[in-house]
């Protein structure tokens, strides 16, 4: 080997060896052997800015659930296929990620949180108390075609009440839906409600009850594919004349008609008054008593495509973003646990589409794209010390502020950039002590000057980063300024 060429060790994942001549490096293996970093189609990574916004949304709705007496649970991502698919239709099975594990068991990833919840109730029935009100926020998977706003992996946010079949539990779920949207700052929305029982009675009069599941799934597409396409698909299984009548049931009256007018219309089509229409009237009266009925409309076209719904059903739309689709939907399912236990347990619940709702909140300007957890960051200014910065941050934390300290004295523009990327609006500069008076260099323990009780009088500069405006004050006055300056 030539004296001016030296063989050096290297990283085996990159190359077997490298030859160095002066400052040039030549690798003996191609870099194309590196694995390309990418996610599966229909799946996503979430950067901190995205995950923070989602975490804040989850925190808000979780507080609403807890305040209404709902408790958290969790279930496995994988279930036996027979547990998930026993009550499903062929369309659902096509969307399920299903496979045999190493032990030859037929298993599948959960496609929603309701079916696993029914299994959970049956398996732990003796350990639970009823009515049992739970919330569950977790990922689900569906193998549908990826498109804008639709993914194969996404988070569902479910809340249900089981063990009581009465108008109040139906109302309670609707009230929580209303409260969650209000807590998120949404004011312009409508919750569309209907009842599967009324629609099934109507189909029975048309002698189509044995085809109800197929018809329900087609009618459920009305808002997506339009009246003409729905009539065309219905005609294939019900005939043209009956297809027209079915669509007329769902859209025969103006959406501006009042609740009782629409209810009387579908009640007549279904053959008269019955427990299902009585339930709708009772629920609506409870909504009126609570002073929230103005955000609810009776919409017979709402059917929900899933098989297990048997009673009241509902979907929620943001009035200013109708193209977004439903952001919260659900209904009553009286027969779901009957698949897993002899005694059936009646239940009612809803699911919030977190990702879709978050996208809508961003479009409406309700959620900032620069949302962050931290109230303020302590910048490391030349001439100061990390000990004074750390002590000041500890003082603010004891005052209830969420504070971060920049760890090293980099250029101030770099520190600004760091804060802005994390969505931090406020920056804090701790004024250095006069030259010769700083005891930070003392080697033995924490000096008296840094005791937390003495930090309150530290002179500081508080900077509002979006506007670059700056205020001189004492550290003890910072908490009030941060709280008063929050947008």
Please provide the spans of the model-predicted regions.
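Short hydrophobic alpha-helical segments enriched in small aliphatic residues
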Residues: 5, 16-18
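Short terminal hydrophobic/aromatic SLiMs and anchors at protein ends
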Residues: 5-8, 439
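Auxiliary tRNA-acceptor-end handling modules of aminoacyl-tRNA synthetases
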Residues: 31-51
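Positively charged, Gly/Ser-enriched RNA/tRNA-binding surfaces
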Residues: 32, 53-68, 79-82, 103-104, ...
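Polyanion/phosphate-binding surface patch
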Residues: 42, 73, 77-107
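Acidic, His- and aromatic-enriched active-site or binding-groove loops in soluble protein domains
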Residues: 94-103, 208-230, 318
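Short, conserved phosphate-binding/catalytic loop or strand-edge motifs used
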Residues: 151-157, 193-201
